[in-house]
C-alpha cells in the first residue's frame, strides 16, 4: 500500500489494493468500478512461474481459473459449468495465467505459464463490465517446494518494477 500511494501521486492514476484471493479480487474490483467508473483496469501482483524461463515482470495475455474442476459432471478442468469459454483474453501478447485460491507448490492440473490468486477474477469482472484489462505479474517464485521462502524473499522486489511500468504506460 505505501508503494501504491507513491505511484498514485507520481502517475496520477487511482490505485486500489484488492486483497488476496478471488473473492476479495471480485469484491474490491467491483467497488473500484462503482467508485471510479474506469475505462481500463491494470492489475499488478506476484505470481509463481511454471516455466523456469519466465522471470521478472511479465504481462498476462490469457486467464484461466485453475481450481475450477467440475470434470466429474463432464466439463473441462477450468470450465465453469454452463459457460462455454474456459479462458479470458483481451487481445494482447503475453503469458497464460492460472488463478486459484491456493498458493501453488506443485504443478496444478490445469497447466499455464504462471499461477496467481486474483487475475482471472478481475479479468472476468472486466469482461462482464466491458472494461479493458491489463495485468502485470512479478515472478516471485517457481511454484515449487521452495515457493513459500522464495515469495517471502522476493515479494518486495516487484514494487519498483511496477512503478516503472505504470510510468511507461500511455493513458
List the predicted regions and their residue ranges.
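Glycine-rich phosphate- or other oxyanion-binding loops that anchor nucleotides, phosphorylated ligands
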Residues: 12-171
Amino acid at each position: 500500500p505505501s508503494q501504491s500511494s507513491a505511484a498514485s501521486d507520481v502517475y496520477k492514476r487511482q490505485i486500489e489494493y484488492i486483497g488476496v484471493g478471488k473473492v476479495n479480487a471480485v469484491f474490491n474490483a467491483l467497488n473500484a468500478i462503482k467508485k471510479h467508473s474506469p475505462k481500463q483496469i491494470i492489475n499488478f501482483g506476484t505470481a509463481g512461474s511454471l516455466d523456469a524461463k519466465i522471470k521478472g515482470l511479465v504481462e498476462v495475455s490469457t486467464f484461466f481459473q485453475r481450481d475450477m474442476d467440475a470434470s466429474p459432471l463432464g466439463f473441462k478442468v477450468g470450465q465453469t459449468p454452463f459457460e462455454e469459454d474456459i479462458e479470458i483474453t483481451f487481445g494482447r501478447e503475453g503469458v497464460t495465467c492460472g488463478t486459484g485460491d491456493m498458493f501453488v507448490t506443485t504443478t496444478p492440473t490445469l497447466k499455464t505459464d504462471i499461477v496467481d490468486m486474483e487475475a482471472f477474477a478481475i479479468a472476468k469482472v472486466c469482461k462482464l463490465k466491458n472494461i479493458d484489462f491489463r495485468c502485470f505479474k512479478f515472478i516471485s517464485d517457481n511454484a515449487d517446494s521452495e515457493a513459500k521462502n522464495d515469495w517471502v524473499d522476493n515479494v518486495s522486489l516487484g514494487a519498483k518494477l511496477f512503478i516503472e511500468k505504470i510510468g511507461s504506460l500511455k493513458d
